[in-house]
Amino acid sequence: MPKRNDIKKIMIIGSGPIIIGQAAEFDYAGTQACLALKEEGYEVVLVNSNPATIMTDREIADTVYIEPITLEFVSKILRKERPDALLPTLGGQTGLNMAMELSKTGILEELNVELLGTKLSAIDQAEDRELFKELCESINEPLCASDIATTVEEAINIADKIGYPIIVRPAFTMGGTGGGICDTEEELREIVANGLKLSPVTQCLIEESIAGYKEIEYEVMRDSADNAIVVCNMENFDPVGVHTGDSIVFAPSQTLSDNEYQMLRDASLNIIRALKIEGGCNVQLALDPNSYEYRVIEVNPRVSRSSALASKATGYPIAKMSAKIAIGMTLDEIINPVTNKTYAMFEPALDYVVAKIARFPFDKFENGDRHLGTQMKATGEVMAIGRNIEESLLKAVRSLEIGVFHNEMTEAIEADDEKLYEKMVKTQDDRLFYVSEAIRRGIPIEEIADLTKIDIFFLDKLLYIVEIENQLKVNIFEPELLKTAKKNGFSDREIAKLWNVTPEEVRRRRQENKIIPVYKMVDTCAAEFESSTPYFYSTYEWENESKRSDKEKIIVLGSGPIRIGQGVEFDYATVHCVKAIQALGKEAIVINSNPETVSTDFSISDKLYFEPLTFEDVMNVIDLEEPLGVIVQFGGQTAINLAEPLSKAGVKILGTQVEDLDRAEDRDLFEKALQDLDIPQPPGATATNEEEAVANANKIGYPVLIRPSFVLGGRAMEIINNEKDLRDYMNRAVKASPEHPVLVDSYLQGQECEVDAICDGKEVLLPGIMEHIERAGVHSGDSMAVYPPQNLSQAIIDTIVDYTKRLAIGLNCIGMMNIQFVIYEEQVYVIEVNPRASRTVPFLSKVTNIPMAQLATQMILGENLKDLGYEAGLAPTPDMVHVKAPVFSFTKLAKVDSLLGPEMKSTGEAMGSDVTLEKALYKSFEAAKLHMADYGSVLFTVADEDKEETLALAKDFAEIGYSLVATAGTAAFLKENGLYVREVEKLAGGEDEEGTLVEDIRQGRVQAVVNTMGNTRASLTTATDGFRIRQEAISRGIPLFTSLDTVAAILKVMQSRSFTTKNI
C-alpha cells in the first residue's frame, strides 16, 4: 500500500538524556526516522530534551523543540503544532511511556492526533506482563512460569509455588531497572520492595529462572499488510541471566542447528503477527541447550539498542524502514538503500561474523557492584566484524579502550586458582578474561562449560586462540603462523609480546611477507547482488573490495564506545566535521567502532571503516587510502591519544599540531606556556612519589586538588584537606612514577566558567562563555551550565576573552579548543585547556546557532574566520537564557556513590531554554527528572563547614511553605537561628533504620534531601551513613542535592513559582 496522503504533519518524541539502558542508539534511530519522513514529503516536528544529539539539529526535522519530555510540555507543543499524527516508537522507553500518558489524558483524542506505527493496544500487550502472558498462551508460545505481585507478601507466596531461584521484573521500566535474580526469600523481599516503587504501575513479575539457557534474539519487521521478515538473529555468549545489553553478542547465531534456528524464527514471526506490530521489533528467547524446549523472554515493540546493533551488523536500516512502514508503506515496495536493487522484503544474509561487547563504567566507579544480572549496567558498546568468531571477538576486545589488546588482563593473570574459579562463576564485566586465563592454565573446557553455562563451542574458539599463542611463542618470525594469527584477529602488539620484539618489528615483517589486510564490504546480501555501500571491515584474505578514489581524502577518527566522560557529544562533533569536509568537495572517511551512533551510519560519510581505534588498525586504513591527513580533534581523548603515534609514523595530523597538543596536555610544558603568556593559574606542582606530594601540598597550602596527568572526565581526582588524606590517596588511587606524575594544585573554591573557542591561527572566535552553577570542585561535566553568564562583571568577561585569545594564538591552535576558568576573589585563573572539541560543543552550537564543529573543520582545512563572515572575539549573546543540566544513572549502579566531586559521574545531559533564568532552570530540572513538589518536607544533613550557608537556604524553603527536617547537629543550628525544625535520628552506623532519617525517606515523608560531606575525608561512619542516605534517596526517586549551589538554583525556580502571603 502506498504512503498515506491524508496526513501532512507528524510529531516524533525523542528519548531524552542518555542514561544506562537508553543511549546513543536512539539518536541514530530518531535521526534516521526524521530524515526518512522528510524524504517522503511530510512535515516533521521533533520533541527531545537532549541537546547532545544530531537528532535535535535544526536541519533534521522541520521544527525542533528541545523541551522536557513531560506531560506538561509535550501537551503544550501538541496544542501549538496540531500535528496529524504522533510516532512514539523511536524514542525508547521514554517515548513509549510518554505516548501512553498522553493517550490516557485524552489529549490525543481531543486534538484528533493519530498514533502511527504499532498501536497502543499492542504496546500494552507487549509491555504489560499479564496481557503478554495471555497473548502467548493464546498462540501456544511457551513462557516461564510466573505471576504478578503487587505486594512483597504476594511475591513470597508466588515464589514458594514456583521454587527458587526466581527472577523479578518490574513492569514498565527500562534496561531491567529494579529487577534481579533471587536465591533466597531475604533477597526477594529486598528486590521486590524496591521494584514495586520503581514500577509506574506498582507491579512486579515473579518468574521461574531459566538461567543457563542460551539467550537468542531475533530482530523482526512487519508491515500493515502482514508481511514479516527477520532482519538479523543474534546469540549471546553469556547464557540467560545477564541483560542482553551487557552480554557479549554474536550475529548471526553460532551454535543453533537449522531446526532450532527455524523453530525460533517461526516463534518470533508468530509473536510479531499476533501483536500486529507495524515496524521493527525485538524478540528475546531462551533455548534449553539440551532439548528443543524454549521460552519467550520478552518483546520490545519498538526500535531498541539491539535494532541499532542489527542495523550496523547487517547494513539494513531498521529505524528508517520502521518510519516508512508507519506511514503505510509495505516491505515489498520500499527499496533497500544498501543494494538500491532489492526490496526491503529481502532478508539480509551475512558472510561474516559480528561481535558486540559492552563497555562498562567500572573504571570510573571502582566501588561499583560489577556483578551482572537482569539490570543493565553498560554505558555503551563496541562492535567488530571479522570472517570468523576469533577475529571479530579479538577486534572487539581491542576496541573497548580498557588498556587491553588481547583477551588477557593483568588482574586475571595474577589471580590465584581460587580467585579464578570465583571470577568465572560470578558473572562480571571482565569474565571473558578470567575464562581465557583458565583455558591458558589448562583447565578443561568441559569443566568451564559446566561452571559457567557458556556453550562449549565458544570455549573451543577461546582454546584455539590459546593454541595459536602457544605456537607463536616457539615459532618466532614464522610467516605462515603469522598469517594464521592475523586471520584470527591477533594484534601486532600481542604477537610482539609473544615474540619479545616491538610491534613495529611485527608490522615490518608483515609488510615484507605481504601479510596485509583487505577490506570487505557490508552489503546485506552476502555478495549475491551488486552493492554500492561504502561500508567496510578488515580481514586477512584475498580480494580487497575497498577501491581508493582519486579525490583528496581526509580521515576523521571517531570517539569509540560511549563511556562516562566521553559521550555522544563527541559523535555529534564527528558528524559535523564530516559534513564540512564534504561541503569543501573532499572525501570524508570515518573510522569508528561504536554501533550505536550516527557517525557509523554508512550514509553519513563517503566511506566508513568499522575498525578498532588503535594505532595498528587506523594505520592499515591510512596505508590503503593515502589521505591528505587525519583529523583527531573531534574524537575525544581516544583520537587525541592516537595523534602522537600516527605523527611519529609520518602521518599528517591536520589542525593543531602534535607538539602543541602536548603543550596543552603536559603539565610542565603547559605551566611554561602560561608563564610566557602571562596568564595566572592556581599554584600547583608535580609529584612523582608520596613524599614529594606531601612537601608540595605543605608549600601550596590545603585544600589541594590532586589528580593524575592525562585524563578525561577527571578519573581518580580528589579534593584533599590534610596530610593524612593525601597519604591515603597516594597509596590508594594512583601509582605515581616519573613517567606518570601526579598533579597537586591549590583548590580555589570560586566560580567556574568554561569557553569553547575556534581559531584559524590568527583570529579567535568565542561562540560563548558558560557559567557553572556549582562551584569549582565539581567536574565541569557534572555541573549545571548557564549561557549567557548571569553573574560575571564586564571586566571579568573581558579578561576571559583576552586570556582565551592569548592561549589560542600562543598554543598555535587551529580548529577547536576548550578552556576552563575559575574566578576567585575577582581574579581569573586558568584551570585547564583541552586542545580539542569538548562535550559542550553540541549545547553551545545549538544555543548560539554557530555550527562550531563545522566551522572548526573549515579552519583545519585552511579557511579563515573573516572570509566565512565571522567577527573575531566574543559572539553577540541572544535574548534567551539556556541551562544545561547533567543527568545521572545511579539507579542502575548499585554501590556507586552519588556525591559530586572532581570525578565525572553523569551519563547524559538535558537542556532548558526560556526568557528568564528561573524558567530555564525549571525546564532543565524537569528535563533531568528532578521534579520538586510545590510543598512538602526537605531533609538537611550537612557538614559543619556548610551550616552557615544552609541557614539561608533553609529560611527560603520555610518561606515558600516547606517543612524542615534535619539531623541533630544541623537541626540544633537551625533552631538556634529561629527556624522550626523536626529533628530525625542519624543512622550512626547502625543497621536498625527504624525511626531514622532513612525510614523517613523510605516512607515518602520527605520530598527532597540535601546532603553535603565537606572536604575533609569523613570518619567511616559518617561516610557510610551519608552513602546510605544518598542511595535511599536515589532508589526512591527523591531529588537529592549534594551541592548547595544546585539547591540555591532550584530554590530560585520554586520562589518564582510561588506567591508570597504576608499579613498587613
From Swiss-Prot:
Mn(2+) 3 binds at residues 820, 832. Its EC number is 6.3.4.16, 6.3.5.5. It catalyses: hydrogencarbonate + L-glutamine + 2 ATP + H2O = carbamoyl phosphate + L-glutamate + 2 ADP + phosphate + 2 H(+). ATP 2 binds at residues 707, 746, 748, 752, 777-780, 820, 832. Residues 930-1064 are annotated as: Allosteric domain. Binds 4 Mg(2+) or Mn(2+) ions per subunit. Mg(2+) 3 binds at residues 820, 832. GO terms for cellular component: cytoplasm. Mn(2+) 4 binds at residues 832, 834. Composed of two chains; the small (or glutamine) chain promotes the hydrolysis of glutamine to ammonia, which is used by the large (or ammonia) chain to synthesize carbamoyl phosphate. Tetramer of heterodimers (alpha,beta)4. NCBIfam families: CPSaseII_lrg, PRK05294.1, PRK12815.1. This is Carbamoyl phosphate synthase large chain. It comes from Lactococcus lactis subsp. cremoris (strain MG1363).
